[in-house]
Regions:
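Conserved SGNH/GDSL esterase-like catalytic core that processes O-acyl groups on lipids
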Residues: 24-124, 148, 153-158, 162
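Active-site flanking residues adjacent to catalytic metal/cofactor-binding acidic residues
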Residues: 50-51, 142, 177
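Charged, glycine-enriched surface loops/patches
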Residues: 118-142, 159, 163-174
Length: 220
């Protein structure tokens, strides 16, 4: 009788844990990553791209960086808290030689209460998690991009970028990659031709700009 009750209790705990996992944002995408990893785990010492949909949609990222082994773990319209939540699933296990982060865009879009300081503190949390579990890890942060559809958020994005840039300049083995100058017209407006019709996600010519900006910082 006791064993039967124990089995029932353990079954309930397992069910609750599974339900809670599925209730987490982007759980399906993370599950797919882990399923793929269980079939063929990526090689160690690769370069990991992680963050939001600007990386997720860069599905042919490996073709932009020939000679490098790239793992792409961009997912959904993720925010920095989402990347933090899943760091133990899609960052730490790979033991990459370098982590390239693009995130923060959706943090501002999610709520007007999110400030540049909010995003900065979230980034530092992610940075500290990576460095604590992968000591000395080479970390790159791609600037939050100037999407025309989110122009009202540009002032906060610029401030967050500056805070992150300043912070990374004081860290070892870390760099901030500024892509704003190449994505703006002479009058300061965003180059609409770089974007899909939603004026948020980029086309191939936008990613070509990112490739040129990122390539000099990639670890051989």
């Amino acid at each position: 009788m006791i064993m039967k009750m124990l089995r029932t209790f353990l079954l309930l705990l397992t069910t609750l844990a599974f339900t809670n996992c599925l209730a987490q944002p982007f759980a399906d995408e993370i599950h797919e990553f882990k399923k793929h990893d269980s079939i063929q785990f990526p090689p160690a010492n690769a370069i990991l791209f992680v963050g939001s949909s600007s990386f997720r949609k860069w599905q042919d990222v490996g073709k932009y960086f020939p000679g490098y082994t790239i793992i792409n773990r961009g997912f959904g319209g993720s925010t920095l808290p989402d990347v933090i939540r899943y760091a133990d699933d899609i960052i730490i296990p790979y033991h990459p030689k370098q982590v390239v982060i693009y995130c923060g865009d959706n943090d501002f879009a999610a709520s007007d209460k999110v400030t540049a300081d909010t995003v900065f503190e979230r980034f530092k949390t992610l940075f500290d998690i990576i460095r604590s579990k992968l000591p000395g890890e080479n970390i790159l942060f791609v600037a939050i991009k100037p999407s025309p559809s989110r122009k009202r958020l540009w002032p906060k994005m610029k401030q967050a970028n500056l805070l992150i840039k300043t912070y990374l300049s004081l860290q070892t083995n870390a760099h901030f990659i500024d892509i704003w100058p190449q994505m703006l017209n002479a009058d300061g407006s965003g180059k609409r031709e770089l974007f899909e019709p939603d004026m948020l996600h980029m086309k191939a010519n936008g990613y070509a700009i990112w490739q040129k900006a990122i390539a000099p910082y990639l670890s051989k």
